[in-house]
Design a protein with these regions (language model features):
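Predominantly soluble domains enriched in secretory-pathway, periplasmic, or organellar proteins
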Residues: 1-314
């Protein structure tokens, strides 16, 4: 089967999910979505995208928001189905574990929902409290047994056990307004970015004991572990990327982005390059060896989450 490398992304203010040819920037498809979709996750076969219907413009806007996860067929470029999250609303953080289970985080109700067979059942099989207030993002161990939730109003990160509700959430501090988070590849370390304190905190992924910090630029919103074993912070306020040694927490490099950086994605077959969504409605490509950043292609309004996939030719 012939495939083309494709960047798929949410266009938050365009209320859509689109795919772009990675080399030409040509739009391959656009799927209309309800107002203000935000985060998404890709299934194990890398053929379905699950998009959370947040339903309000930003975390600072009032409203109940949406109560669904929309499945998008990435090969056909069309809607595939809907997972019903009601009565839980403002679906933001989205994750998928190694077994294909979908995890959806309700920011309004501070609940983590689990869809154990999303292709067969469109309602949650499990729901567990996040242990925080205004729970915004989450990251997941590969087996789905541990979830880490950052909450904007309780200013906490919590360790949640989605498949054992008898275990209460374990909370820790990681600075005010923690948001971006990621696990080390061996899942022993958790990294959390504080938007208000401009800092990364490293925590033991089992105990949440702090083991190091690093200062970032203004307003770090996302963290990524790169193929070259660097921790990358996206600084929304500073309009920059900063690179850190994840073991020593030493800063290694800075890349100014011009526009505000929103999301980063690595190429599965080309570990030397990453693609960066920017708030000027564009995607840039970053050479991870030279740290040169250049324009790649224009997008719809406010690109958000981003992934690089080999999708079948139409």
């Amino acid at each position: 089967m012939d495939t083309r490398w494709t960047a798929v992304l949410v266009e938050k203010f365009g209320h859509s999910f689109s795919g772009y040819d990675l080399h030409t920037g040509t739009r391959r498809f656009t799927v209309a979505l309800p107002e203000y979709p935000h985060e998404f996750a890709i299934d194990r076969d890398r053929l379905l995208g699950y998009v959370g219907h947040y339903g309000v413009q930003t975390f600072a806007h009032p409203g109940d928001g949406g109560a669904a996860v929309i499945a998008v067929d990435l090969a056909r470029g069309q809607r595939h189905g809907v997972l019903d999250c009601a009565p839980w609303h403002r679906i933001h953080g989205l994750q998928i574990d190694a077994q294909g289970r979908v995890y959806a985080l309700s920011e309004r109700d501070n609940m983590l929902l689990v869809f154990e067979a999303p292709s067969a059942r469109q309602t949650p099989d499990r729901a567990v409290p996040s242990g925080g207030v205004k729970s915004h993002l989450c990251v997941l161990s590969r087996d789905g047994r541990r979830a880490y939730v950052t909450s904007l109003l309780s200013h906490t990160v919590t360790l949640v056990h989605p498949h054992d509700a008898t275990r209460p959430p374990l909370a820790a501090r990681a600075g005010r307004r923690p948001e971006g988070c990621c696990l080390s590849p061996d899942e022993s370390l958790l990294y959390v970015a504080s938007r208000d304190e401009h800092r990364i905190t490293r925590l033991d992924a089992h105990t949440l004991a702090e083991s190091g910090t690093a200062e970032t630029g203004e307003d770090p919103t996302r963290l990524y572990w790169s193929p070259c074993n660097r921790l990358i912070a996206l600084n929304y306020g500073e309009r920059s990327l900063r690179f850190f040694d994840p073991y020593t927490m030493a800063e290694l490099a800075r890349v100014d982005t011009g526009a505000k950086p929103i999301a980063l994605a690595f190429h599965p077959a080309d570990p030397g390059h990453a693609w960066l969504a920017l708030n000027d409605d564009s995607v840039g490509v970053l050479d991870l060896r030279t740290l040169a950043l250049r324009h790649a292609f224009a997008t719809g309004k406010e690109p958000d989450g981003l992934a690089i996939l080999a999708l079948p030719q139409p």
